[in-house]
């Protein structure tokens, strides 16, 4: 769909000592962004460190926020509402999580 590419942005909180094991928020954000861009063909709007978001800064485990698109953009809104794009997003998120945990949860 020409002109219908989405924009994906990933937000993360920098790690601190209380984070479980060696799991890394920045690494999770990078892996997820790569998986989403490759799986959906969307544009990379960036990976952004956010220390001010309680939903991220109060966790003791890896945590990110994936912004899958922006409804303020009419073309993007149409894209986000399609089953095909939603399925690509879900598959990409699953692939990214599988990659992240395969690298980080070794015995």
Which residues make up each language-model segment?
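Active-site-proximal helix/loop segments of hydrolytic enzymes
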Residues: 1-107
């Amino acid at each position: 769909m020409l002109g219908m590419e989405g924009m994906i942005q990933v937000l993360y909180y920098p790690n601190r000592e209380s984070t479980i094991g060696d799991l890394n928020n920045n690494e999770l954000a990078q892996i997820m962004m790569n998986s989403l861009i490759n799986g959906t063909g969307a544009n990379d709007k960036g990976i952004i460190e956010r220390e001010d978001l309680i939903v991220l800064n109060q966790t003791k485990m890896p945590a990110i926020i994936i912004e899958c698109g922006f409804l303020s953009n009419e073309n993007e809104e149409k894209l986000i509402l399609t089953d095909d794009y939603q399925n690509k997003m879900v598959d990409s998120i699953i692939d990214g999580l599988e990659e992240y945990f395969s690298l980080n949860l070794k015995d």
